[in-house]
């Protein structure tokens, strides 16, 4: 079976079980666009155009943390950058300006609405902010947007970096004390950071003075993160705890970053190549069922716990759980598979779930 066909089947299954919307749905649109572009599939490319044409005016929008979601987020911006959508009257700049006007902390890092006083930031935001602003900047030829994309990624990663393990905490400012971070090293949270870093490394102009800093953070995170890969090829809900349950959506996001690092030559060596192949095969084997339903993806997770346990590793492990067909899984899995295809693994032996 073609690797990209598995990605399309995942999307179709997702589309059958629920309406694809909210930020995790927009991630699936982004991955559908990438898979269609790689496959050069006219029908899938048209599907992308039709889905994204509904944004912003013909969608029953849920609550969003970031205004770019109202315009289709990264999927819209990337599709325009790649020429999948050609619309001279596009509104990328309009929504980029709205993004830049959102609440910020004292260092200029975007906060959740109303959260600037406590400095409330989430690493999840990196995947929402940086790719959209980068592609909007490239399409609009606006250096301000490109710089903002890099600055937000760097700012979030530096603010939430745990130097003791070179991994990333999910959030800051949600435990009742300004500046106090969560204690976790959550798989999907580190994956969100990794996606933003990886997209910047691939598309940020190399002459940017910010490119080397992005590369340094990416390489440090890469070196740390592969140490914790389980024998199954997956990473765990709490990356640093060997007894924690495996978590598939974070694994898939991490694999996307590893794939870009390998393909661009930023990551070199057998250890990264082995980790990537082992991870994709683990995802195929343990997390994708025969009907393309999914397993082992953590439900929504926003600094879990109460009182003194809020934001602790214990809370991330005991108050959250993995769910069958969890909606964060689909776009993340598609990401990993698209990157496997780009790295030369264009076929999968479906019976054994091994890459060819």
What label would you give each PLM region?
Residues 21-28, 68-72, 120-123, 127-130, ...:
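Start-of-helix signal in alpha-solenoid helical-repeat scaffolds, especially tetratricopeptide repeats
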Residues 43-50, 55-175, 180-183, 290, ...:
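Extended ligand-binding groove/face enriched in aromatic
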Residues 132, 196, 221, 329-332, ...:
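Hydrophobic alpha-helical segments typical of transmembrane helices
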């Amino acid at each position: 079976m073609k690797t990209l066909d598995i990605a399309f089947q995942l999307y179709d299954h997702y589309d059958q079980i629920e309406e694809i919307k909210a930020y995790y749905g927009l991630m699936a649109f982004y991955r559908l666009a990438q898979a269609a572009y790689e496959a050069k599939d006219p029908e899938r490319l048209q599907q992308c155009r039709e889905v994204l044409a509904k944004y912003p005016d013909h969608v029953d929008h849920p609550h969003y943390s970031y205004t770019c979601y109202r315009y289709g987020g990264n999927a819209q911006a990337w599709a325009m950058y790649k020429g999948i959508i050609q619309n001279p009257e596009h509104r990328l700049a309009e929504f980029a300006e709205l993004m830049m006007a959102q609440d910020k902390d004292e260092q200029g890092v975007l906060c959740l609405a109303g959260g600037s006083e406590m400095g409330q930031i989430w690493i999840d935001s990196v995947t929402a902010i940086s790719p959209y602003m980068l592609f909007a900047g490239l399409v609009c030829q606006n250096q301000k947007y490109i710089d903002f994309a890099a600055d937000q990624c760097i700012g979030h990663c530096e603010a939430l970096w745990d130097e003791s393990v070179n991994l990333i905490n999910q959030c800051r400012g949600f435990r009742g004390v300004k500046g106090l971070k969560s204690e976790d090293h959550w798989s999907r949270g580190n994956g969100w950071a990794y996606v933003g870093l990886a997209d910047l490394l691939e598309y940020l102009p190399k002459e940017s003075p910010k490119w080397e800093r992005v590369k340094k953070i990416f390489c440090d995170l890469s070196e740390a993160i592969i140490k914790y890969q389980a024998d199954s090829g997956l990473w765990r809900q709490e990356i640093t705890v060997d007894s924690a349950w495996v978590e598939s959506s974070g694994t898939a996001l991490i694999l996307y970053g590893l794939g870009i690092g390998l393909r661009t030559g930023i990551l070199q060596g057998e250890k990264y190549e082995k980790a990537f192949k082992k991870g994709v095969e683990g995802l195929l084997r343990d997390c994708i069922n025969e009907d393309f339903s999914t397993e082992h993806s953590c439900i929504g997770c926003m600094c879990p716990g109460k009182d003194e346990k809020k934001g602790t590793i214990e809370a991330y492990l005991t108050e959250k759980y993995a769910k069958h067909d969890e909606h964060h899984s689909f776009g993340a899995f598609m990401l990993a598979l698209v990157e496997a295809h780009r790295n030369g693994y264009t076929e999968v032996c479906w019976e054994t779930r091994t890459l060819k």
